């Protein structure tokens, strides 16, 4: 297969929106992280719910992970 015959790869996400995605995703992730910490500090061992803890931490880690991914893409570290 010839190199000229191949089509150039284009990103599914426009690089112009990397800064906006970074800020929004990291802000949402930090909100859920703060909520998780406040929940852990203010609840007693009798009122804690493992499902709620896991759900909040999963959502926080997903948003923070994708936020860091777009931060790396924004600064030019293409992963």
Curated annotation (Swiss-Prot):
Q: Which InterPro entries match?
A: TMEM258/Ost5
> One Pfam family from the UniProt entry?
Ost5
The answer to whether UniProt assigns keyword Hydrolase to this entry is no
Q: Any ranges marked Cytoplasmic in the topology annotation, and which?
A: 38-54
BP GO annotations: protein glycosylation; response to endoplasmic reticulum stress
One Gene Ontology term of the molecular function aspect:
oligosaccharyltransferase complex binding
Function of the molecule: Subunit of the oligosaccharyl transferase (OST) complex that catalyzes the initial transfer of a defined glycan (Glc(3)Man(9)GlcNAc(2) in eukaryotes) from the lipid carrier dolichol-pyrophosphate to an asparagine residue within an Asn-X-Ser/Thr consensus motif in nascent polypeptide chains, the first step in protein N-glycosylation. N-glycosylation occurs cotranslationally and the complex associates with the Sec61 complex at the channel-forming translocon complex that mediates protein translocation across the endoplasmic reticulum (ER). All subunits are required for a maximal enzyme activity.
Membrane-spanning ranges: 17-37, 55-75
The membrane-topology field of this record reads:
Multi-pass membrane protein
The answer, when asked if Endoplasmic reticulum is one of the entry's keywords, is yes
Q: Which PANTHER family match?
A: TRANSMEMBRANE PROTEIN 258
**Protein name per its UniProtKB record:** Dolichyl-diphosphooligosaccharide--protein glycosyltransferase subunit TMEM258
**Which keywords belong to this entry?**
Acetylation, Cytoplasm, Endoplasmic reticulum, Membrane, Transmembrane, Transmembrane helix
GO cellular component terms attached to this protein's record: cytoplasm; endoplasmic reticulum membrane; membrane; oligosaccharyltransferase complex
Q: Tell me which parts of the chain lie in the Lumenal compartment.
A: 1-16, 76-79
N-acetylmethionine is carried by which residues? 1
Q: Specify where it is mainly localized.
A: membrane
Subunit and partners: Component of the oligosaccharyltransferase (OST) complex. OST exists in two different complex forms which contain common core subunits RPN1, RPN2, OST48, OST4, DAD1 and TMEM258, either STT3A or STT3B as catalytic subunits, and form-specific accessory subunits. STT3A complex assembly occurs through the formation of 3 subcomplexes. Subcomplex 1 contains RPN1 and TMEM258, subcomplex 2 contains the STT3A-specific subunits STT3A, DC2/OSTC, and KCP2 as well as the core subunit OST4, and subcomplex 3 contains RPN2, DAD1, and OST48.
Naturally occurring in which organism (per UniProt): Canis lupus familiaris
Q: Where in the cell is it found?
A: Membrane; Endoplasmic reticulum; Cytoplasm
Concerning its family, UniProt says: Belongs to the OST5 family.
Question: What metabolic or biological pathway is this protein involved in?
Answer: Protein modification; protein glycosylation
């Amino acid at each position: 297969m010839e190199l000229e015959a191949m089509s150039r790869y284009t990103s599914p996400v426009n690089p112009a929106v990397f800064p906006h995605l970074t800020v929004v995703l990291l802000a949402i992730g930090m909100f859920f992280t703060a909520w998780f910490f406040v929940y852990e500090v203010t609840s007693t061992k009798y009122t804690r719910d493992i499902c709620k803890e896991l759900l909040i931490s999963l959502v926080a880690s997903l948003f923070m992970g994708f936020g860091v991914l777009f931060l790396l893409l924004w600064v030019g570290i293409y992963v």
